[in-house]
Regions:
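Long amphipathic N-terminal alpha/beta scaffold segment
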Residues: 1-20
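A structural signal for short, well-ordered beta-strand segments
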Residues: 5, 35, 93-97
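Catalytic core of non-heme Fe(II) oxygenases with the double-stranded beta-helix
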Residues: 14-71, 90, 104-107
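Catalytic core of Fe(II)/2-oxoglutarate
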Residues: 56-131
Length: 131
């Protein structure tokens, strides 16, 4: 899992990320799974907008109440933010997980935004379930 989750605030009249993208555009593994956990209601223009199928361009908001979350394919689906025209800020946490059988300890790829290599101890931590 992503060692340090991303904390985001999307204030009114602002965006939370720089531009429309797929996470693979920033060196992420095509096998990563995104988690989006809003800490305030996420709706309308104060949330993430994403297409439903890669390349379709049918952008819709990921709307959720506090306590709800999304598991989605941010690696392959183009997504971003619109300018928040609501009068409410959105506060959220997002993070990524990678199935261990898809992990490549020899990768040279690194996170563009964090400058961390996509390896255990740098970008990722390992979750070991207790029996």
């Amino acid at each position: 899992y992503q060692k340090s989750p991303t904390f985001r605030v999307q204030a009114p009249n602002n965006i939370a990320v720089g531009g429309w993208h797929r996470d693979r555009d920033y060196n992420h593994s095509p096998h990563e799974i995104n988690m989006f956990l809003p800490l305030t209601p996420a709706y309308g223009t104060n949330t993430i907008w994403t297409e439903s199928i890669e390349g379709l361009g049918d952008y819709k908001p990921l709307e959720a109440e506090v306590g709800e979350y999304y598991v989605w394919d941010g690696v392959n689906l183009n997504h971003g933010n619109k300018v928040n025209t609501t009068n409410k800020s959105r506060v959220s946490i997002d993070f990524r997980v990678l199935p261990y059988d898809k992990y490549d300890p020899g990768t040279e790829a690194f996170s563009v935004s964090r400058g961390k290599k996509f390896i255990l101890g740098d970008y990722y931590s390992l979750y070991e379930a207790k029996k």
